From Swiss-Prot:
Alphabetical keyword list: Calcium, Capsid protein, Disulfide bond, Glycoprotein, Host endoplasmic reticulum, Host-virus interaction, Metal-binding, Outer capsid protein, Signal, T=13 icosahedral capsid protein, Virion
Gene Ontology terms for molecular function: metal ion binding
Provenance organism: Rotavirus A (isolate RVA/Cow/Japan/KN-4/1983/G6P8[11])
Residues at which Ca(2+) 2 binds: Q177, D228, V229, D231, D301
Gene Ontology CC terms: host cell endoplasmic reticulum lumen; T=13 icosahedral viral capsid; viral outer capsid
Family to which this protein belongs: Belongs to the rotavirus VP7 family.
Residues engaged in binding Ca(2+) 1: D95, G206, T214, E216
Residue numbers spanned by region LVD motif: 237-239
Name used for this protein in its record: Outer capsid glycoprotein VP7
């Protein structure tokens, strides 16, 4: 009888020892697998230089795009400068070597040959359709025209500020602007924008939601339109979508690597939407209208002072993203 009890106790103790040994063996094997896996992951991360992107992604409709830039932090010596000018400037100068001449003059101000790029555009309307600013510093020359004041101010507002934009499905949804920074930006070969404000019952205020002819017209056949309506009120929109793209945009703040030089005109254009604030003229400058050679000489002479009012950056305005990023 006692022999059976001793045997049972012995078997129980041996079982405990065996189970303990098995568990320790499993633990060592799992530790080996886990540590080896982590080692491989770390090694692969170092080799591939992988970046882990979180779920908080930026709005995909941003008109900004990152681009590779080999310049250093030293001002002027290795930065790039883009100078945008209307085609009438080169037509008036009528000299095939005038850009080389300007490059040599910029060299006297500390800008190495090859660091200054000359970008030509047809006119304000054409430039408004798809402005693209790629350099560390961008200076846009706009000749003043009293008949194009609104177009010039809207273009300046677009390129002097950073915007985040989302697509708008105006056939299915009503839209409202939440605050002063919220605007609807339209670009295309011909943009006609009509709006119908709605009351709390989604009935038109002074218009019929089913009849676009009763909508209020805020823009007709324009290339660039920045629409500002009453904040906090839903609107039904009618847009010439075949020739125009509209986006719901939020102004983030100044794009400090861009400056606009107004050529001619009595006063600098005010691009402030709020009539109760002081005119927004940051990085808006003016030179007297003479000959285009005189304009370029003035820019060269004051280029470093102009740059001091700006901030270098390595992101560009690429409005192609306005059309294709959704």
């Amino acid at each position: 009888m006692y022999g059976i009890e001793y045997t049972t106790i012995l078997i129980f103790l041996v079982s405990i020892i065996l189970i303990n040994y098995i568990l320790k063996s499993i633990t060592r094997i799992m530790d080996y697998i886990i540590y080896r896996f982590l080692f491989v992951v770390v090694l692969m991360a170092i080799v591939t230089s992988a970046q882990n992107y979180g779920v908080n992604l930026p709005i995909t409709g941003s008109m900004d795009t990152a681009y590779a830039n080999s310049t250093q932090n030293e001002p002027f010596l290795t930065s790039t400068l883009c100078l945008y000018y209307p085609i009438e400037a080169s037509n008036e100068i009528a000299d095939t070597e005038w850009r080389n001449t300007l490059s040599q003059l910029f060299l006297t101000k500390g800008w190495p040959t090859g660091s200054v790029y000359f970008k030509e555009y047809a006119d304000i309307a054409a430039f408004s359709v798809e402005p693209q600013l790629y350099c560390d510093y961008n200076i846009v020359l706009m000749k003043y025209d009293s008949t194009l004041e609104l177009d010039m101010s809207e273009l300046a507002d677009l390129i002097l500020n950073e915007w985040l934009c989302n697509p708008m499905d105006i056939t299915l949804y009503y839209y409202q602007q939440t605050d002063e920074a919220n605007k609807w930006i339209s670009m295309g070969s011909s943009c006609t924008i009509k709006v119908c404000p709605l009351n709390t019952q989604t009935l038109g205020i002074g218009c019929s939601t089913t009849n676009p002819d009763t909508f209020e017209t805020v823009a007709t056949a324009e290339k660039l339109v920045i629409t500002d309506v009453v904040d906090g009120v839903n609107h039904k929109l009618d847009v010439t979508t075949a020739t125009c793209t509209i986006r719901n945009c939020k102004k983030l703040g100044p794009r400090e690597n861009v400056a606009v030089i107004q050529v001619g005109g009595a006063n600098i254009l005010d691009i402030t939407a709020d009539p109760t604030t002081a005119p927004q003229t940051e990085r808006m400058m003016r030179v007297n209208w003479k000959k285009w050679w005189q304009v370029f000489y003035t820019v060269v002479d004051y280029v470093n002072q102009i740059i001091q009012a700006m901030s270098r950056r390595s992101r560009s305005l690429n409005s192609a993203a306005f059309y294709y990023r959704v």
